[in-house]
Design a protein with these regions (language model features):
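Surface-exposed loop and membrane-interface regions of Gram-negative outer-membrane beta-barrel proteins
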Residues: 90, 107-171
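Residues that define the transmembrane beta-barrel architecture of outer-membrane proteins
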Residues: 70, 92-96, 113, 132-136, ...
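Short loop/turn motifs that connect adjacent beta-strands in outer-membrane beta-barrel proteins
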Residues: 59-71, 105-115, 130, 145-152, ...
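Outer-membrane beta-barrel "beta-signal"
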Residues: 41, 260-262, 285-299
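Membrane-embedded beta-strand positions of outer-membrane beta-barrel proteins
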Residues: 74-76, 100, 115-119, 140, ...
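Transmembrane beta-strands of outer-membrane beta-barrel pores
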Residues: 78-84, 104, 119-125, 144, ...
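N-terminal periplasmic/intermembrane-space "pro-region" immediately following the signal or transit peptide
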Residues: 2-73
Length: 299
């Protein structure tokens, strides 16, 4: 009788231990763990066009965003001059400049990189004897946005096309570029390096180095109005500089500007100049100091 009671007690203890062990070791495919993984993944899913959400650790997420879930933007601008790296492309006349871009979502929450394609255009004027009427640029590249969009990068390609230009002038060319930037809050800085294996007008190898600092003005009197100032400086090197129409193989350009954004419309006034005098700029004033006003809107 005593042995029977001891056996029953041992059996009950074994059943209790087994039940405790089962509750403590939930299977990896159980609903509880699956719900936790879904919630964790949702918390770390980035908004399209933004960097990944800040979390303590990333889940083993391998899903890539759909290729057609991106964003389309269109910008329309009008300016009193089209200045390309300090040199007027319209002989100081008005320019109209539309731009269209499609950007994909970021690849994943752990790889905040997106791809983009687009086109940008402007009227140009190179003189009465030159039939070129417009520049149309085709662009493509990869963009990085990390650290809550504070760190940005752009690895891009531009194909410059000049409508109406005779083929034997070799105006069309390719350019590759890398742009890096960081937003410190009180100021944003950007730097770029651009390379062309054969620049405008068959001018050979060309390099352009550029830097810019933008400072938002903290004063606000309306939530729909914002101000900022910026300064930029660049250096252009051209191998066969005479083909490009300048007097030496490199020059500097710089500008200082002020932008007011009013209900989504950007109004910019900029002072632009180069170190190229008239004799070194094809005996024109296209490289001289000037003020350029631009109005633009992005949709």
């Amino acid at each position: 009788m005593v042995l029977k009671k001891e056996a029953e007690l041992a059996l009950r203890l074994f059943i209790l231990c087994a039940a405790s062990a089962t509750n403590a070791q939930t299977p990896s495919g159980s609903p509880n763990q699956q719900n936790a993984e879904v919630q964790n993944a949702q918390a770390q899913t980035p908004t399209p066009g933004q960097g990944p959400a800040q979390t303590t650790e990333a889940p083993p997420e391998k899903k890539w965003n759909a290729p057609f879930g991106g964003r389309f933007t269109a910008t329309f601008a009008a300016a009193t001059d089209y200045s390309y790296r300090g040199i007027s492309q319209t002989q100081r006349q008005v320019a109209f400049q539309p731009a269209f871009t499609y950007e994909t979502p970021t690849i994943s929450e752990t790889v905040p990189v997106s791809a983009y394609v687009g086109a940008w255009g402007s009227n140009v004027y190179f003189g009465n004897t030159n039939p070129t009427i417009a520049e149309v640029d085709l662009i493509a590249g990869l963009r990085l946005k990390a650290l809550n969009d504070k760190l940005t990068g752009d690895l891009g390609y531009i194909r410059y096309n000049y409508l109406g230009a005779p083929a034997d002038l070799f105006y069309d060319f390719n350019e590759f570029g890398l742009v890096l930037g960081y937003d410190f809050g009180v100021a944003q800085i950007q730097g770029a390096v651009r390379y062309s294996p054969n620049f405008f007008a068959n001018a050979g190898v060309a390099w352009y180095k550029w830097g810019q600092v933008t400072v938002p003005i903290p004063y606000t009197f309306n939530e729909n109005v914002a101000f900022k100032i910026y300064g930029a400086v660049g250096n252009q090197y051209v191998e066969r500089f005479t083909n490009y129409g300048i007097g030496n193989n490199n020059y500097w350009d710089w500008q200082i500007g002020f932008t007011a954004t009013v209900y989504g419309v950007d109004l910019t006034i900029a002072y632009i100049d180069t170190n190229l005098d008239v004799p070194y700029c094809g005996n024109t004033m296209n490289c001289d100091a000037r003020a350029v006003f631009t109005i633009s809107k992005t949709f």
